[in-house]
């Protein structure tokens, strides 16, 4: 805890420095950051699970309390209004007392609407608001031009790519939780449990509820692995176990882990060998990574490796690996991007930004679903998650195209019952090395 305290103190200094610079550039006095408000279910008296504003949890590790407020100006100690009402209907969070509370000015907010008079001395025409409720900002007297001002958001989003020591420490803790879940899920798969029960084993091991994980767990058996974001969770076990893909994370102090593994249930099958080769290809790509290279270059290099596997297994024949890539023959097998920035959000902000003004560099036309085009730099946390799938809807156009004779359609049918493969690690870019948080915890 003592180490986390010193890291948090430096983290707050970094956020204060960024805020001071942002306010100066945008001619603002302060920024009001709203944790958010519950969203009610239509024609019902219940709410959807609360998800906190990412800009809020960047400052304080409070992720499950609505109606909280931060006022920051880059100079004075951040003011934190913590909502803790008297309520016998619902559980109420007590005022926090932890290593981080000494770095902010903690103020008890007993009633939601009391924030009006609490903030009155601080709100002026040069106050910005970052949060989900425009009407609430208006009621507090914030100028509409300063509500989620895009230029201000661009500034914050750009620098969010560079993680502080505190953020990296939190992300390493999230990795530990997620790895525990992945080990439990693998054992549940080996015990031939259903997707639903595998997911329960994962949640138990991480100490999370379904609403706590940073994204809906993808727990896919057999051909379900061909659905990139499969979240159905069958209660019934399949008649035959062929493959298992799990894409699941965890969260610590608001920071996410995002890990994927694929397993084969068949010892002597080409799919088992393909999983191993994909794992080797992913590790080989990471071994080449370094600061100063554009992320999209690594995405293209992964497609070259996919072409090599298509050639090795005879899935695509009679065409060079170079032409496979240039003509897009690898894209139905790897339809998504190599990965993305990771942090306060799973797909963290600023992946396309080339500067703090928000200059946008789109993904290459051939790879429209790539989520990051930035130069890889020290302090960044990225996912590396190549895939290799057998998806009918993506392969269908190639059955009729000019390259149709180069595909071994019989072999593709042979692989289809296994769905596909995705292998994902979370890495930190350092000056002279790549830290693989996932592999450092010995998750094979």
Curated annotation (Swiss-Prot):
EC number(s) given by UniProt: 3.4.13.9
Annotated cofactor note: Binds 2 manganese ions per subunit.
UniProt entry keywords in alphabetical sequence: Dipeptidase, Hydrolase, Manganese, Metal-binding, Metalloprotease, Protease
Catalytic activity reported: Xaa-L-Pro dipeptide + H2O = an L-alpha-amino acid + L-proline
Keyword flag 4Fe-4S: no
Binding site for Mn(2+) 2: 247, 258, 424
Cofactor names: Mn(2+)
Domain of life: Bacteria
Example of a GO cellular component annotation carried by this entry: cytosol
SUPFAM superfamilies, alphabetized: Creatinase/aminopeptidase
Gene Ontology BP, a term: proteolysis
GO molecular function, one term: aminopeptidase activity
Ligand binding (Mn(2+) 1): 258, 340, 385, 424
Enzyme superclass (EC): hydrolase
Family the UniProt entry places it in: Belongs to the peptidase M24B family. Bacterial-type prolidase subfamily.
Biological role: Splits dipeptides with a prolyl residue in the C-terminal position.
PANTHER family hit by this protein: XAA-PRO AMINOPEPTIDASE 3 (PTHR43226), XAA-PRO DIPEPTIDASE (PTHR43226:SF8)
HAMAP family registered for this protein in UniProt: X_Pro_dipeptid
Protein name, per record: Xaa-Pro dipeptidase
Protein's organism: Proteus mirabilis (strain HI4320)
